[in-house]
Regions:
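Solvent-exposed, well-ordered loop and adjacent helix/strand elements within mature globular domains
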Residues: 1-97
Length: 97
């Protein structure tokens, strides 16, 4: 894993599997494998391999209490929680194509 980096590529993220940045654990899931009902998002599309919303936020899964919260990510843009995901509030799941 990698600690506290910014602008990591999607390919590197997939290779590593887990990234720790800004006191958060980032993992990923494919929208094809985990198409939760939380992914019913207006304007959802894929950009550079990441699932994003109409405002270009990377779509995240996290503890249900964090829904719609915005986070800095190590991918050069912010993410927004839409889907229920990990129970630990410091764990954010990034949706990819």
């Amino acid at each position: 894993n990698i600690n506290n980096i910014n602008n990591i590529s999607l390919d590197d993220f997939i290779y590593l599997g887990v990234i720790y940045s800004n006191n958060y654990k980032f993992t990923y899931a494919s929208q094809r494998v985990a198409p939760g009902r939380g992914l019913n998002i207006p304007g959802r599309h894929v950009k550079n391999g990441f699932v994003v919303d109409k405002d270009d936020y990377i779509v995240l899964g996290a503890h249900p209490d964090l829904r719609y919260k915005i986070y800095d990510t190590p991918f050069g843009k912010q993410g927004k929680v839409y889907d229920a995901g990990p129970i630990n509030k410091n764990h954010l799941n990034v949706y990819i194509e």
